[in-house]
UniProtKB/Swiss-Prot annotation:
This is Homeobox protein Hox-C9a. InterPro entries: Abd-B_homeobox_TF (IPR050803), HD (IPR001356), HD_metazoa (IPR020479), Homeobox_CS (IPR017970), Homeodomain-like_sf (IPR009057), Hox9_activation_N (IPR006711), HXA9/HXB9/HXC9 (IPR017112). The gene is hoxc9a. One of its GO terms (molecular function) is DNA-binding transcription factor activity, RNA polymerase II-specific. It comes from Takifugu rubripes. It is found in: Nucleus. Gene3D superfamilies: Homeodomain-like (1.10.10.60). Keywords: Developmental protein, DNA-binding, Homeobox, Nucleus, Transcription, Transcription regulation. Its main location: nucleus. Sequence-specific transcription factor which is part of a developmental regulatory system that provides cells with specific positional identities on the anterior-posterior axis.
Amino acid sequence: MSTTGPITNYYVDSLINHENEDVLAAARFSAQGSHPAGPRTTSLVPECADFPSCSFAPKAPVFSTSWAPMHTQPSVGYHPYSHQPHLATDSRYMRSWLEPISGAVPFHGYPGNGRHYGLKPDAFQEHRAGDCLGSTGRTYADYLYCTADIRDKTHQNIPSPEPELVASGKHKDEKPELDPNNPVANWIHARSTRKKRCPYTKYQTLELEKEFLFNMYLTRDRRFEVARVLNLTERQVKIWFQNRRMKMKKMNKEKNDSKEQ
């Protein structure tokens, strides 16, 4: 076996086990190919003889029934999921996906196309259509398809808020805000605290004139009685008598001046 020369091809080839190479090649190509390979050789079987053979029980299928094809229905848009009937009445919103629905509520004045898409149940009400034009008895359809004269009359009937705004602006300009720290401005725009004058009626004036002819000065008891009869206060009776005496004095003075001249 000991040779001084290089190892020849015949010697190397004799050391390689060609039988094992054929078995490994057959196993590799049988795993990659679609067709099962033939029975393996018994050269590798003794290595796994100590292990018992594994047997698995067949598992029940997950889905007992077979899959049925879904029914296709005409739709406008994409359906992310199927409709759930138990949520149709209790949910706050109606269908949130695009789907043609029969018996939809059309707009007033527009032809209904039998479709409505994801609207709230209270989106349309019966009395909303006549809110703006309900006073004139016309609907939106009459307003859209009517002539220009009727539209002009409708605009003329609507009151314009501009005069009210102008009047309120003038009213604000006439009453400027007063500065509480400026005494001059407060004095100029000061209001009198005197009460509004309450004139006497003809009946009250006549009765007071009669009482003045009898007595120019009233006692307290008589003043109380006159005030009670004429439905006046004692202060009103007192002031009237004071003014009447001043008027009488002035008239007497004018008479004396006229006589001297």
